[in-house]
C-alpha cells in the first residue's frame, strides 16, 4: 500500500523539525511518530500506484468497448429504420 520508507522519511523530517529539547527523546519519539503516521494512513482508503495504473487501463479498455458498442447499436438502428421504410411485398398490389 504505502512505502514504509516514505513513512520513515516523513517521521524523520517531523522529528528533525522539532526543537532540540524534544528531539532528545530520540528514537522513541520517532517510533511513536512512525506508528501514528502508519495508523492514520491505513485508515485512508488509498491504492498503490500500480493498482491505480491497472484500473486506469481497465477503464480505457471499457470506454473503447463502450464506444464500439454504441457505434454498433447506431448501425443496427439505422439498418432497422431502412428496413421499415421499404414497402412490404405482401401489401403491394400484384403486378401483371
UniProtKB/Swiss-Prot annotation:
Pathway: Cofactor biosynthesis; ubiquinone biosynthesis. The keyword Cytoplasm applies. Keywords: Coiled coil, Cytoplasm, Ubiquinone biosynthesis. It holds the Pfam family BMFP. Its main location: cytoplasm. GO terms for biological process: ubiquinone biosynthetic process. GO terms for molecular function: identical protein binding. Residues 59-86 form a coiled coil. Disruption phenotype: Deletion of the gene impacts ubiquinone biosynthesis in aerobic conditions but does not decrease menaquinone biosynthesis. Mutant accumulates octaprenylphenol, an early intermediate of the ubiquinone biosynthetic pathway. InterPro entries: UbiK (IPR007475). Required for efficient ubiquinone (coenzyme Q) biosynthesis under aerobic conditions. UbiK is probably an accessory factor of Ubi enzymes and facilitates ubiquinone biosynthesis by acting as an assembly factor, a targeting factor, or both. Dispensable for ubiquinone biosynthesis under anaerobiosis. Belongs to the UbiK family. Homotrimer. Component of the Ubi complex metabolon, which regroups five ubiquinone biosynthesis proteins (UbiE, UbiF, UbiG, UbiH and UbiI) and two accessory factors (UbiK and the lipid-binding protein UbiJ). Interacts with the C-terminal part of UbiJ and forms a complex composed of 2 UbiK subunits and 1 UbiJ subunit. The UbiK-UbiJ complex interacts with palmitoleic acid. NCBIfam families: UbiqAccUbiK. This is Ubiquinone biosynthesis accessory factor UbiK. It comes from Escherichia coli (strain K12). The lineage of its organism: Bacteria, Pseudomonadati, Pseudomonadota, Gammaproteobacteria, Enterobacterales. The gene is ubiK.
Amino acid at each position: 500500500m504505502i512505502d514504509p520508507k516514505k513513512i520513515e522519511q516523513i517521521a524523520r523530517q517531523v522529528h528533525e523539525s522539532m526543537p532540540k529539547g524534544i528531539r532528545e527523546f530520540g528514537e522513541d519519539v520517532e517510533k511513536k511518530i512512525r506508528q501514528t503516521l502508519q495508523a492514520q494512513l491505513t485508515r485512508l482508503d488509498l491504492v498503490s500506484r500500480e493498482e491505480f495504473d491497472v484500473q486506469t487501463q481497465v477503464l480505457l479498455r471499457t470506454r473503447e468497448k463502450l464506444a464500439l458498442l454504441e457505434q454498433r447499436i447506431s448501425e443496427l438502428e439505422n439498418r432497422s429504420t431502412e428496413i421499415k421504410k421499404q414497402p412490404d411485398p405482401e401489401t403491394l398490389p400484384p403486378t401483371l
